């Protein structure tokens, strides 16, 4: 088919998608980093460039850039500052100077606070973007019954200069973390790879794990694997194809029990609906009950799977 006809077909498909967008259910955006390389010779003077973004499809940035602060861990475990960092409208990019032989970890760790407080008889939500450092300023004077939960997100990718090493995988004991059984820069299609996930330093059992291959624009549908961690927090993934794979696991979220002796189903803030007047506990005009939030922890990594 001539290039002009292909371009016309693509534009027609995009226009049709835009027309149907209001009635479509949009997939949740994914946070990711994409390295320019995952393996280096190890000359002692090499450069790694990383893109960081939030998008619906991997790895095509289509959401506003986030206020992330990436860092790198060198093979000896020391923290390395990223260089040449720049933020655009849709992505953040930065460089890592690869000097030491071994495996580097590039990470973005973010904390936010969700919750609510009672003020003048009305329960109000904490503003979006609240962090542990700004929580005190986010709660107005006179507020009582403050409910809050710290949500932690960890995004990682890896690169190895020369032979792979494992010092950078020493867990911090905080949040969701990955400790590899199979080294993440030694992956091949058709081969099994095992990773262990820890929650606050302990095996994270029975958590759902998703592995998604990038390049969906050039594939007939999303290539996604859905698995579950075992009692030791381990999961084994057999990669069906080569590519840059995004692996994600999450825990928590929703809301806790409604009160002492009672329970309420987990629900997001969007799902909360006010009760009809007269049916409010405590009489008409009483504040609608909102259960305390539960901390949400998430982990995602981008790994390269080579052809076997």
Question: Predicted regions: what is each one?
Answer:
Residues 111-119, 253-259:
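Short acidic/polar inter-strand loop motif in beta-rich domains
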Residues 9-21:
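Bacterial N-terminal signal peptides
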Residues 88-92, 223-243:
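Glycine-centered loop-to-beta-strand initiation motif
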Residues 48-87:
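N-terminal, post-signal-peptide region of Sec/Tat-exported proteins
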Residues 71-79, 208-226:
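Short amphipathic beta-strand segments in non-cytosolic proteins
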Residues 20-29:
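Sec/Tat signal peptide C-region and signal peptidase I cleavage site
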Residues 97-102, 239-243:
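Surface-exposed, short loops/turns at beta-strand junctions within beta-sandwich domains
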Residues 28-48, 132-194, 198-204, 213-219, ...:
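Beta-strand-rich domain onsets/edges
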